[in-house]
C-alpha cells in the first residue's frame, strides 16, 4: 500500500473508534473491555471509565500467543478468569475501531462462552 492509502485506512479506523467510544461507558461493575490487535499479537484490558483506570489486562505477547483465532479463544478464556477474580460478570465490549470479524469476534465469543455477559 502506498502512503496515501495507509493514511486513509488509519483515518477511517480512527473515525470508527471515536464513534464507537462515544456510545460506550464502563464503570466498576460493568467495565469496558478494550481490545488491540497488532500484526503479530493481541491485547485486551478492562477499563473503568469513571475512575479512568485499568482494572485488569492481558498481554498475548508476554504469554506467547500470536494474533490468530485459536490463540484469541485461549486468551479470551484466560481473560474471563481474570475478570471473575476481580468480581466482574458483565462488561461492555469495545472493539476499538476494528471490524467484528476474525480474532476480534473470536475473543468476544470466548468471553461469552466462559460466563462474561457482553
From Swiss-Prot:
InterPro entries: Ribosomal_uL18_bac-type, Ribosomal_uL18_bac/euk. It comes from the Bacteria. Keywords: Ribonucleoprotein, Ribosomal protein, RNA-binding, rRNA-binding. GO terms for cellular component: cytosolic large ribosomal subunit. GO terms for biological process: translation. One of its GO terms (molecular function) is 5S rRNA binding. Part of the 50S ribosomal subunit; part of the 5S rRNA/L5/L18/L25 subcomplex. Contacts the 5S and 23S rRNAs. This is one of the proteins that bind and probably mediate the attachment of the 5S RNA into the large ribosomal subunit, where it forms part of the central protuberance. Belongs to the universal ribosomal protein uL18 family. This is Large ribosomal subunit protein uL18.
Amino acid at each position: 500500500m502506498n502512503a496515501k492509502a495507509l493514511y486513509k485506512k488509519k483515518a477511517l479506523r480512527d473515525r470508527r473508534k471515536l464513534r464507537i467510544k462515544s456510545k460506550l461507558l464502563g464503570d466498576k461493575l460493568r467495565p469496558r473491555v478494550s481490545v488491540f490487535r497488532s500484526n503479530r499479537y493481541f491485547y485486551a484490558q478492562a477499563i473503568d471509565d469513571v475512575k479512568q483506570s485499568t482494572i485488569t489486562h492481558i498481554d498475548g505477547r508476554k504469554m506467547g500467543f500470536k494474533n490468530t483465532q485459536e490463540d484469541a479463544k485461549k486468551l479470551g478464556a484466560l481473560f474471563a478468569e481474570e475478570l471473575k477474580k476481580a468480581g466482574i460478570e458483565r462488561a461492555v465490549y469495545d472493539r476499538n475501531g476494528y471490524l467484528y470479524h476474525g480474532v476480534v469476534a473470536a475473543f468476544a465469543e470466548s468471553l461469552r462462552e466462559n460466563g462474561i455477559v457482553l
